[in-house]
């Protein structure tokens, strides 16, 4: 794929902005509402967004895959693929919204809190709003308009601050939920206009009259989308089922609020690597369709390399500075979430490897492998949570998720080696562990009170790479994305 490095830097930058905005939202909402109402808010929003992420992304992702395969070879098919995916997605989302609205009393009953019913009903409107914005996100992924994607993602982050925090301040929990409806609607409107401005410019073949648009098989989209949708369903449940089991088993809004804070901040490494999956699926779809096995292996190897180099310091520093990060985002009232968050953050590292490599397999059309692995992981996670939460509380929930994530990481690494003929470098892992251990030890020697931990963390993050460079692990090729961005060479749409 051309300009892989520059596109990755753009998308990573947008993910950083988006997630920083997200943590501003979480911090502000948590402080405004307090632990109990923040726990209720977390339950409502997490469940609703989980549904749209897992059910609503299968068809758009399939659209993205097929757009990527034909965008250079036969761009006249772009409108047909888009129209068929839009039709299927609209039918699905309207149905899911109706079912969720009608099921709200049952969901609240299962959570032993009937007062959640009106909030769940209101949150059902998040589903079509979120789906509308996400549809264009995957549309632009398939067309490799990565720079436009990055701009829209940043806009969405800022819109979340404006709407969610503003509405929470004036209207409480209902306002927070309403903000989740308004923010993606704004982004959808911008993306809709951008489609008219940019798509015809880069792909003149898409100017065909409506009657001339080539038909595209809905069956082909659905055959790819259903196992992918199940994968997203099982994966999202693995990352969130512990929160619902904490609520159901412990029946404490306060404990739920603490755990929601722990897992929200603990997911930072995963969110930053999400940009890699955005590029990886369409890139591997394209190289697989072209039967370019050498380029496919190169992309997977490069992704593994990025995971090794970047994931170790992120997870290590987040664990080292957990108390300070929690205090920064939520204040002293959430200090009791420190130990669960440290354990959960380690699990997020394992789960990030699983998620990124799953999209490499999905891009190659091997969608049933991640689907099956995630199903096994979900069953194991539920069983461990039910066993651990009554005995160990929040620590048990975090430990259960981490153990399940470790098993999933091992499984996906085996599948990746088998199907792409690539594997993790044992020497690179060993050197990264050495560097991570060094910065973890130094973290407790450098200033960490108040906001000094941010400066200390930056120094240690740079020091990690300096150490790898010193021992010969970090090469010039590893630094090429940053060099290309600074030099301005290459372009990404």
Language-model regions, residue ranges each:
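Signature of the first transmembrane helix
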Residues: 3-61, 97-101, 126, 161, ...
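Membrane-interface junctions at transmembrane-helix termini in multi-pass inner-membrane proteins
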Residues: 129-155, 345-376
